[in-house]
Structures are given as C-alpha cells and as structure tokens.
Amino acid sequence: CKVAHTYIHRRQTTDRFSSLHRPPDPDRWLLLPCCSEEARGPPPSPAPLPARLFPGRASSPLARTPSAGAASACKPLLERLPTPSRRRRRRRATRRARSRMPRTTPWRAPRAPARAWWTRPRMARAR
C-alpha cells in the first residue's frame, strides 16, 4: 500500500491542473480504501487477456497469465544484472586535438593550427 501512497501523493503534488492538486497531507492517506486492512481483501488475480490480442498464441499458457509470462521473460535479465561491468578503455590523449576530424570538410577548408601573435605576418610590412 506504500507504493500507492507515494504514487498518489506524487500525482497530487506535481499535477498543477488536477483537481487533486494540494500540498501533501499524510492524514488524507487514511481515507484511501487500500489503507484499511479489512477493506483490501486478497490480492486480485491477474485478469485473463482476451484471445483476440494474441491470435497466434491464444492457446499458450502465457497468453492467459500475463504476469507469469512477464516474470519468466524478465528472469534472465534479472539474473544477468549483478554482473560487474568491464572497465572502460581510456582513449589516449593525442597531441593535436583536431587529429580525429576529417582532413577535408566539404563546406570549408580545414582549419590551420592557431599561431601565436608574434609569429603572425605583419599587416603593413611593405618597404
């Protein structure tokens, strides 16, 4: 029931245009029908899916119990999950930052490396 609490509480506090929008109030949670022990009975069984959604697999047991099929499909993923990830290979820093760019770019000439101001050619040097 805690999950329903947090979900309803989050919807109330984040939906600005909802009629339920109000600051969080834990006392209102007691009015929810799922919170009293006698109000919520046994957990509901998963509803059987209609056969026309899966015409080919209507006779398979997975089509009638969606939760069991989802759990069995997720099990190899859950078993593989705690495998430690491999360390990322670090790419060595190259001397020129533009070395990974293509040599020629179709819409402009490749950039010449920037030169210091004292090596730039003087503008009016004509003698």
Curated annotation (Swiss-Prot):
Superkingdom to which the source organism belongs: Eukaryota
Chain intervals for the UniProt region annotation (Disordered): 39-127
Residue spans of biased composition, Low complexity class: 102-121
Coiled coil regions, renumbered to chain: none
Biased composition (Basic residues): 85-101
Further comment: Contains several arginine residues in close proximity which may be involved in protein RNA interactions.
Protein name: Cold-regulated protein 1
Organism classification: Eukaryota, Viridiplantae, Streptophyta, Embryophyta, Tracheophyta
